[in-house]
């Protein structure tokens, strides 16, 4: 039997999603909790492996089990055994053809900047702070130059292992709610550090250090060293993963929760 779960986590205390030796990971904590409820060793497959310090409100995983449990066991039961910064949001039994990673058609990331004079004491690990005024309209206009299928070498981490730098951005929107600036970006797939590298360059445009058409120039360079520094991980969230409608997976609000209030 194959089961899918929606997972939310604050990544500040973890060395990323993926299980690693001698350091704590989100995957390790989730598998330990699931194994207690299933009464056997559980290994999960995820939609996207987030880096150290990166969060998620919309991670999707699947696992195999022969254990017959009510849905409440896979939600409340697993949550009772998880640290407070990781939570199961939903559960659904899925067809054996479903794969959390390979069935996904798109991933939606959200980068949140607190644009204020002083860094916040609360939510500090769930935001990126930038003190200079940012022009949201210029940032949004600049972001539209990244839409479609393009070579994103200039926004690719040097150690990225992807076979191709060509990805397709379906949607890129930048909005503001009070002092929060929100960068929403959806693509078929992402290169390592791609969203944070794009965010870093958008910030340079927003504060007036670079012109609105700078991203177009960076795409043409195909050179990571020409773009801005990588934005900090604390502001980044994997908020949603798209799948074919045949799987009929739940679609809760993207979050994070403090933006929904």
From Swiss-Prot:
Enzymatic reactions: uridine(38/39/40) in tRNA = pseudouridine(38/39/40) in tRNA
Binding-site residues, substrate: 109
GO biological process, alphabetically ordered: tRNA pseudouridine synthesis
SUPFAM superfamilies referenced in this protein's UniProt entry, alphabetically: Pseudouridine synthase
InterPro entries, A to Z: PsdUridine_synth_cat_dom_sf, PsdUridine_synth_TruA, PsdUridine_synth_TruA_a/b_dom, PsdUridine_synth_TruA_C, TruA/RsuA/RluB/E/F_N
Stored PANTHER family: PSEUDOURIDYLATE SYNTHASE, TRNA PSEUDOURIDINE SYNTHASE-LIKE 1
Family note: Belongs to the tRNA pseudouridine synthase TruA family.
CDD domains: PseudoU_synth_EcTruA
Active-site residue list: 51 (nucleophile)
Functional note: Formation of pseudouridine at positions 38, 39 and 40 in the anticodon stem and loop of transfer RNAs.
NCBIfam families: hisT_truA
Protein name: tRNA pseudouridine synthase A
Pfam families from the UniProt entry: PseudoU_synth_1
Assembly and interaction partners: Homodimer.
Domain of life: Bacteria
Gene this protein is translated from: truA
One MF annotation (Gene Ontology) recorded for this entry: tRNA pseudouridine(38-40) synthase activity
Keywords: Isomerase, tRNA processing
Entry EC no(s): 5.4.99.12
